[in-house]
Regions:
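Short beta-strand His + acidic residue motifs that chelate non-heme Fe in jelly-roll/DSBH
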Residues: 31-32, 55-57, 74-75, 79-87
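Signature of the catalytic double-stranded beta-helix
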Residues: 1-20
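A short secondary-structure junction signal
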Residues: 29-34, 56-61, 105-106
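Conserved short histidine dyad/triad with adjacent acidic residue
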Residues: 20-38
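A short hydrophobic beta-strand segment most commonly corresponding to one strand
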Residues: 42-48, 71-73, 87-105
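Short, conserved beta-strand element in jelly-roll/cupin
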Residues: 22, 39-54
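A short beta-strand-loop-beta hairpin characteristic of the jelly-roll/cupin
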Residues: 48-68
């Protein structure tokens, strides 16, 4: 996770949440906005660990394929969606990072 955020130059990063998220082949995540809460304070990073050319992500009016092994910051407060038109499931490793996480947010949820 630290390698994925190196360019942010955090002094004291905290990683309160990490998960694997699967989007099955042929499935869609409809356009939505994640709730505010701590999302206003965190950077949400997606790293595709299994993907295919038909796995697409839409945010800010832009549709793109997120390449295997690359790290992408996603603004999940803005409207976003995803679709997987490929034959293989898409799996992303997703984690949150704060600079000096607020008290009570230092636990890791996996």
């Amino acid at each position: 996770m630290r390698a994925a955020i190196r360019d942010y130059a955090f002094v004291s990063p905290e990683f309160p949440k990490a998960m694997l998220a699967r989007l099955e082949a042929g499935h869609v995540i409809d356009p939505h906005r994640d709730g505010a809460g701590s999302n206003l304070l965190t950077h949400k990073i997606h790293i595709p660990v299994q993907t295919n050319p038909g796995a697409l992500f839409c945010a800010g009016g832009e549709v793109r394929h997120l390449a295997l092994g690359q790290a992408y910051e996603v603004n999940n407060i803005g409207e976003h969606s995803a679709r997987n038109d490929g034959a293989q499931d898409r799996i992303h490793f997703i984690f949150e990072v704060f600079e000096n996480a607020p008290e009570g947010r230092r636990e890791v949820a996996v």
